[in-house]
Swiss-Prot record:
The organism's taxonomic lineage, starting at the top: Bacteria, Pseudomonadati, Pseudomonadota, Gammaproteobacteria, Pseudomonadales
Name of the featured protein: Argininosuccinate lyase
One cellular component term from this protein's GO annotations in UniProt: cytosol
Name of encoding gene: argH
Record's catalysed reaction(s): 2-(N(omega)-L-arginino)succinate = fumarate + L-arginine
One of the GO BP terms on file: L-arginine biosynthetic process
Record organism: Ectopseudomonas mendocina (strain ymp) (Pseudomonas mendocina)
Pathway: Amino-acid biosynthesis; L-arginine biosynthesis; L-arginine from L-ornithine and carbamoyl phosphate: step 3/3
Length: 464
C-alpha cells in the first residue's frame, strides 16, 4: 500500500491521494466560490462566538477576523488563487487563512463542520438574493402602476380562449399582472422567514461537545432563530426547494406576460410597440424587429422549472443526515435565482417603456361582438330570465355574423326583431365606454376602479 500522503484536511485516515480525475469530479469550488462573502461572514461570527465562550482568545479571534477580511479583499481584487485540490470555497479560504496567520487559522473550524457551514452559507446567500429579487418585483410593480394609471381609459378587447370576449381597459389588464406579482412577493417574503433560521452549531450531524452559544452567532448573522435539530440542520434543503417553487410561479407569470407582449407586438395584433433597445433584428430579413426580451424570458422559465424538479429529485431518496448528493443543490439554486432576478430586471426596465397603440386596440374591441353580454344584461334588467336573454342575444349575434354587422351597428328595428323589450336606450349599453364603465365595482374594469386600484397598489408598495 502506498504511503504517499494526501494534502486534504481530512487526509489523516487515508494512505494515498485522491485520484486526479476524482478530485476534479468531486470538487465544487468552481461554482460554490460565489459563496465566499457569506462564508467569510459566517466564519467571522463563528470565531467571535468561540472567543465569547472561551474556546478562542481575543487575540486569536482578532487574527482570524483580520485575516479573513484580507482574504475577502484578495478575492474581490481578483488576486485569490482558487485551488481545485482544496475542493470547495470553505477549504480554499481556510487554507489561505492558515497561510496568512499561521496555526491560529487551523483553530477556526473548532466546533464546526463543513456540513453546517455550507448550510449556513447557502441560507445567508439566498436571504440576500431574495431581498434583491423583492426589490425588483417592487420596481416592476411600480412600472405597472404608472402605465395602468396612464391607460385607465384605454379600451382593448379582453380575451377568453384567445377569442374576443368583453371590452376591458388596458389599465385593468395591466393590473392583473400587478396582482400576480403581489402574490409572488408574499411567497418570497414567506420563504425568507424559513430561510432565515441558522443551522450553524449542528456540526457534522449531532451537534458539538464545545460550549457554543448558537444564539450569539445567530444574532451576529441576522438570523431570526436557530434550528431546533442538528440532523435536520445539516440535511434540510426545503428552503431552497421552496424558493425554486416560488421562483417557478413568478417565472410562470412573467412567461404568460411575455406571451402577451409577443402577440401584441405582432403585425396581426399591433396593440403595442416596444422600444428598439428591448428588441433585436434578423441577420437575413431587414424588416424584422423581434421582441427578444419577452421571448427569452418565456424560454428561460423552463430553466427555473428544471431547477425545482432537479432539487426535488435530488432530495427525495436521501437518508439523514448529510450526503454528498447535496453538493448538487447549489447550481440549480444559483441558476434559478439568477434567472428570476435578471428576468424581473429586464421587465422592470421594459414595462414603463411600452407604447400602446390606442386606436388599434379600440378598433379590435369593436369587433367580435364584445358587448353581447351587455345586451343580455340589458334584457335581464327589462325583466327577462338570463337564460332566455342569452338565447336571444345568440340569435342576434348569428344575424350579425351573416349580415356583417356588430351589435352596435344594427338599427333599432334590426335589434327589436329578436326582442320587443329592446328600446332606444340600448345603444348606450352597446358602446365600449358604456360596457367598461358599467363594471364599476372593486376589481372591475371601469376606469375609476382602475384608478382606485392604482392608488391601493401604491399604498401597498409604500408599506413594504
Amino acid at each position: 500500500m502506498s504511503s504517499e500522503k494526501t494534502n486534504q484536511s481530512w487526509g489523516g485516515r487515508f494512505s494515498e491521494p485522491v485520484d486526479a480525475f476524482v478530485a476534479r469530479f468531486t470538487a465544487s469550488v468552481e461554482f460554490d466560490k460565489r459563496l465566499y462573502r457569506h462564508d467569510i461572514m459566517g466564519s467571522i461570527a463563528h470565531a467571535s462566538m468561540l472567543a465569547k465562550v472561551g474556546v478562542l482568545t481575543d487575540a486569536e479571534r482578532d487574527a482570524i477576523e483580520g485575516g479573513l477580511k484580507q482574504i475577502q479583499g484578495e478575492i474581490e481584487a481578483g488576486q485569490f488563487d482558487w485551488r481545485v485540490d482544496l475542493e470547495d470555497v470553505h477549504m480554499n479560504i481556510e487554507a489561505r487563512l492558515t497561510d496568512r496567520i499561521g496555526v491560529t487559522g487551523k483553530k477556526l473550524h473548532t466546533g464546526r463542520s463543513r456540513n453546517d457551514q455550507v448550510a449556513t452559507d447557502i441560507r445567508l446567500w439566498l436571504r440576500d438574493e431574495i431581498d434583491v429579487i423583492l426589490a425588483e418585483i417592487t420596481r416592476l410593480q411600480q412600472g405597472l402602476l404608472g402605465l395602468a394609471e396612464a391607460e385607465a381609459d384605454t379600451i382593448m378587447p379582453g380575451f377568453t380562449h384567445l377569442q374576443t370576449a368583453q371590452p376591458v381597459t388596458f389599465g385593468h389588464h395591466l393590473l392583473a399582472w400587478f396582482e400576480m406579482l403581489s402574490r409572488d412577493y408574499e411567497r418570497l417574503v414567506d420563504c425568507r422567514k424559513r430561510t432565515n433560521r441558522m443551522p450553524l452549531g449542528s456540526a457534522a450531524l449531532a451537534g458539538t461537545t464545545y460550549p457554543i452559544q448558537r444564539e450569539i452567532t445567530a444574532e451576529l448573522l441576522g438570523f431570526d432563530a436557530v434550528g431546533g435539530n442538528s440532523l435536520d440542520g445539516v440535511s434540510d434543503r426545503d428552503f431552497a426547494i421552496e424558493f425554486c417553487a416560488a421562483a417557478s410561479l413568478a417565472m410562470m407569470h412573467l412567461s404568460r406576460f411575455s406571451e402577451e407582449l409577443v402577440l401584441w407586438t405582432s403585425a396581426q395584433f399591433q396593440f403595442i410597440d416596444l422600444p428598439d433597445r428591448f428588441c433585436t433584428g434578423s441577420s437575413i430579413m431587414p424588416q424584422k424587429k423581434n421582441p427578444d426580451v419577452p421571448e427569452l424570458v418565456r424560454g428561460k422559465t423552463g430553466r427555473v422549472f428544471g431547477a425545482l424538479t432537479g432539487l426535488l429529485t435530488l432530495m427525495k431518496g436521501q437518508p439523514l443526515a448529510y450526503n454528498k448528493d447535496n453538493q448538487e443543490d447549489k447550481e440549480p439554486l444559483f441558476d434559478a435565482a439568477d434567472t428570476l432576478r435578471d428576468s424581473l430586471r429586464a421587465f422592470a426596465d421594459m414595462v414603463p417603456a411600452i407604447k400602446p397603440k390606442r386606436e388599434i386596440m379600440r378598433e379590435a374591441a369593436l369587433r367580435g361582438f364584445s358587448t353581447a353580454t351587455d345586451l343580455a344584461d340589458y334584457l335581464v334588467r327589462k325583466g327577462l330570465p338570463f337564460r332566455d336573454c342569452h338565447e336571444i342575444v345568440g340569435h342576434a349575434v348569428k344575424y350579425g355574423v351573416h349580415s356583417g354587422k356588430d351589435l352596435a351597428e344594427m338599427s333599432l328595428d334590426e335589434l327589436r326583431q329578436f326582442s320587443d323589450q329592446i328600446d332606444d336606450d340600448v345603444f348606450a349599453v352597446l358602446t365600449l365606454e358604456g360596457s367598461v364603465g358599467a363594471r364599476d365595482h372593486i376589481g372591475g374594469t371601469a376606469p375609476n376602479q382602475v384608478r382606485a386600484a392604482v392608488a391601493r397598489g401604491r399604498e401597498l408598495l409604500s408599506a413594504r
